[in-house]
Amino acid sequence: MATTLEIIQDALDRLCIARRPSTLDVTDDTQRQMLALLNETGQDLCLAFQWQALTVPVVTPAADDNNNLSDQGEVATLCPGLSRFVDDCLYLNGRMMPLIGPVDVQGRTFLRAGGMSVLYGFFVEQGHLWITSPTTSEQELRFAYISKNWARDSQGSGIDRLTQETDVPLLDARLLTLGTVWRWLSRNGLPYQQEFLNYDNALRVLQAADTPRGIISASGPHTYNPRRSLLGGVARPWA
């Protein structure tokens, strides 16, 4: 995987700008701007797509909480570096459908009042994850989330911003380079349309390659939908 310095040097080469010293020097205006634009590119990519490299699966015991709203604990502990939850991917053992959410105040009130009690909902409030039903520690909470930490430092710790030349992004280095190049041209008032098209094309190709393929249905043209299938695997004709 390419380091921060290697990506910046690649971007300088593409722009026909002389490379700076072999170390990252943030007192140099060009390198400082390149670093800022590289971070902007990485952070935008993190928010724009559900990258598999940033997807974190979690399996943890549910909390012992008999209240209608059960507190599962601090989100910062359950999901270090949380950017957002993966849609339709929060399950409680013993229930065949994913928990609905994050639900708004109206939805919470509806579920707590007994409306469609077969469904559980979840929401985040005051830094805690809540489920709209009692839970026990015998149950397991299973979900996945997207991490905001799109890079690693030299110690292997997740980070959401590059600061050192040895930091390593988890996203595609070429895509980050192309994103940095078109942003640099734009910021400096230079034509950037072709470089943006190059970036956008690379982004689409990588998104297509990174998207898991759907499950083939043996029951006709029905698409697989975990919310509508009784058994995870083959979509049912009545789904």
Protein language model annotation of sequence segments:
Residues 1-239:
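Glycine-enriched, solvent-exposed interface loops adjoining structured elements
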